[in-house]
From Swiss-Prot:
Stated name of the protein: UvrABC system protein B
Gene Ontology terms: biological process: nucleotide-excision repair; SOS response
PANTHER family per record: UVRABC SYSTEM PROTEIN B
Keywords from the UniProt entry: ATP-binding, Cytoplasm, DNA damage, DNA excision, DNA repair, Excision nuclease, Nucleotide-binding, SOS response
Length: 701
């Protein structure tokens, strides 16, 4: 089933590098999980309460099992958070990030009722695309790989076999005609550009060919003597500094959808045959408009494929390129893993239904396009996997959740591994049920107590209107409050949470955003209004997740305002009290005094604002003397320690342009939640500006 490739994967061991040692429930959980998985259990569930260190447990488990691992997260933000934490703990292994590369995506659709065709429109994030290619490259070249992915991993990707077949292997001493090498690069979808040297392009200078692989930040230089490869070097694309030499380099294609000439011919023949068949069906049914539309669109796409090797919406023809039978599942990221890989599904109560629901939503939209002649029926096979297909392609699976869903519990017969004792000794919050009469006055009283103690409060309501009204009312009373809702963009959301932590305001009001993955140690009170209104926002799982937001504070409390105790409330309170009793008993037995969680508050957003003002002033001064600015070369410097040294070789005008470009990159990195990259760029900009000021004082041009 899985294609066998000739490429050799390097076999470095998984290794956790950290000052931490397993504590609380972690040692027992790691031991039991390893025992079950090594014993061949197909499914295992870790019931890990909020703040018990599930990420660290996963890292130590991977080190113990020594198996490539796929971690699936419910959204991009949690995937980035998990990947960053794993990278810190496993610095010598390949921890990759694989999520949808669209910043904005409007899928192709047709609305028959109004005869409206909506063309596909999207904006691709190049850095995320690089990380996707980096993930597939790592999977095919090394065994010590962990990929943290969103549900994007069950969507179609080119076949790993074709990806490897199109790969170019270059070795020192190898004989190859230079023009043949350039032809190979073009077939792999690389573009020649001798002026703007960016990712996915190559340039030629005499017998030297330089490429920036689409999955890398560094360039590869191939030096030839005649038809023989003399040297292979890795270099920095901006400074040209040589960072290393190799005897062999693999260059993977610039696209996951790449096909050789023979496969392209077969695919085009298949598309044309399907077109004739479908046109006959439409004409027989009297659908002449649909037939004409399909003929025009498909003929144009075929011409583009013949001339350019690709076309808009090429993924809709993936079945023909892969040589798959109608109705067969697509190739996905799962096919790039070795046979023995482990799957970890985090926040499984959300992620499992999400994986299961992707297929139907996609099929409903495509069905309309096919019926009305916008696409061939084979477009239906460019789709996500169904749940059953996903299960067939995955082996052993570990489900992580503070509130495992019915599917996971059924798979293990309710026999879960528990991790409810926190290494810090913190216990689950005390839950208090209060009547709804006078609830707002009581809430205001509780908020004032917390504000005096410099603690924070989360308030969760049922409707947007109620959240807005409550925010206005609290503001009128002089309480520092903000409202978090779905229309706030991602970066502003991160900023709001940070402002809550540092104390810019004391209360955050929300609806359904105060649940999975929010890490707020300063919050000592979570108030749940209308806790007795049954529905998905007040189900047992939702309540336990919301209660968990107060579990990172020594004196955390949850106040539920309700007139009756529903079954969901009773179950959530009972489970919280069970965990709390177990945690208190453990602390008493081991003499542990709960320690407040001190988690560093990221200063990235704050420093971006300061950096902006400083950069604007410096650039204005620097530009005042000369008109016109050269376009700086793309990329980022390799590290702040070498920046000042490298900058000495740049003229002042070019240095100012580089500062401006890196500032843009810093903002983009922050917007993409790549905070480590943004912080690194911030440090580089500081070094460059120091050099620029020095040149300014010395009067150097």
């Amino acid at each position: 089933m899985r294609p066998v490739t000739d490429i050799q994967r390097t076999d470095r061991p998984f290794e956790v590098v950290t000052d931490m040692v397993p504590a609380g429930d972690q040692p027992a959980a790691i031991e039991e999980l390893a025992r079950r998985i090594q014993g061949g259990a197909a499914d295992t569930v870790l019931l890990g309460a909020t703040g018990t260190g599930k990420t660290a447990t996963v890292a130590w488990l991977i080190e113990r099992l020594q198996r490539p691992t796929l971690v699936i997260q419910p959204n991009k933000t949690l995937a980035a958070q998990f990947a960053n934490e794993l990278r810190e703990m496993m610095p010598h292994n390949a921890v990759e990030y694989f999520v949808s590369y669209y910043d904005y995506y409007q899928p192709e659709a047709y609305v028959p009722q109004t005869d409206t065709y909506i063309e596909k429109d999207s904006s691709i994030n190049e850095e995320v695309e690089r990380l996707r290619h980096s993930a597939t490259t790592a999977l095919l070249t090394r065994r010590d790989t962990v990929v943290v992915a969103s549900v994007s991993c069950i969507y179609g990707l080119g076949t790993p076999q074709e990806y490897v077949d199109r790969m170019a292997t270059v070795e020192v001493g190898m004989e190859i005609d230079r023009d043949e090498l350039l032809r190979r690069l073009v077939e792999m979808q690389y573009t020649r550009n001798d002026v703007a040297f960016t990712r996915g392009t190559f340039r030629v200078r005499g017998d030297t060919v330089e490429i920036i692989p689409v999955y890398d930040e560094l360039a590869v230089r191939i030096e030839m003597f005649g038809d023989e490869i003399e040297r292979l070097m890795t270099l920095h694309p901006i400074t040209g500094e040589v960072l290393g030499e190799s005897d062999r380099v693999y260059i993977f294609p610039a696209s996951h959808y790449v096909a050789g000439p023979e496969r392209m011919r077969k695919a085009i023949a298949g598309i044309q045959a399907e077109l004739e068949e479908r046109l006959a069906e439409l004409e027989a049914a009297g659908k002449l408009l649909e037939a004409q539309r399909l003929r025009m669109r498909t003929t144009y796409d075929v011409e583009m494929l013949e001339q350019m090797g690709t076309c808009a919406g090429v993924e809709n023809y993936s079945r023909h390129f892969d040589g798959r039978a109608p109705g067969s599942p697509p190739n996905t990221l799962l096919d790039y893993f070795p046979e023995d890989f482990l799957v970890v599904i985090d926040e499984s109560h959300v992620t499992v239904p999400q994986i299961g629901g992707m297929y139907e939503g996609d099929a409903a939209r495509k069905r309309t396009l096919v019926e009305h002649g916008f696409r061939l029926p084979s477009a239906m096979d460019n789709r996500p996997l169904t749940w059953d297909e996903f299960r067939e392609r995955t082996g052993q699976t570990l489900y992580l959740s503070a509130t495992p869903g019915p599917y996971e519990l059924e798979r293990v017969g309710g026999d879960v591994v528990e991790q409810v004792i926190r290494p810090t000794g913190l216990v689950d919050p005390e839950v208090i049920v209060k009547p709804t009469e006078g609830q707002i006055d009581d809430l205001v009283h509780e908020i004032r107590i917390r504000a005096e103690r410099d603690e924070r409060v989360l308030v969760t309501t049922l409707t947007k209107k109620m959240a807005e009204d409550l925010t206005d009312y609290l503001t009128d009373l002089g309480i520092r409050v903000r409202y978090l809702h779905s229309e706030i963009d991602t970066l502003r959301r991160v900023e709001l949470l940070r402002e809550l932590r540092v104390g810019v305001f004391d209360v955050l009001v929300g609806i359904n955003l105060l649940r999975e993955g929010l890490d707020l140690p300063e919050v000592s009170l979570v108030a749940i209004l209308d806790a007795d209104k049954e529905g998905f926002l007040r189900s047992e799982r939702s309540l336990i997740q919301t209660i968990g937001r107060a579990a990172r504070h020594v004196s955390g409390q949850v106040h539920m305002y309700a007139d009756t105790v529903t079954d969901a409330m009773a179950a959530a309170i009972e489970e919280t009290n069970r965990r709390r009793a177990k945690q208190l008993a453990y602390n008493a037995e081991h003499g542990i005094d709960p320690k407040p969680l001190r988690k560093k508050i990221a200063d990235i957003l704050d420093s971006l604002a300061r950096e902006d003002a400083d950069t604007a002033e410096l650039l204005a001064r620097s530009r005042g003397e000369k008109r016109g600015t050269p376009t700086p070369r793309s990329g980022a410097l390799s590290g702040p320690d070498r920046v000042a040294e490298q900058a000495k070789n740049l003229p002042r005008e070019e240095l100012a342009a580089l500062v401006e470009q890196l500032t843009e990159q810093m903002h983009q990195a922050a917007a993409d939640l790549q905070f480590e990259l943004a912080a690194r760029l911030r440090d580089e900009i500081k070094e460059l500006k120091r050099e620029l000021r020095g040149m300014e004082e010395a009067g150097i041009g």
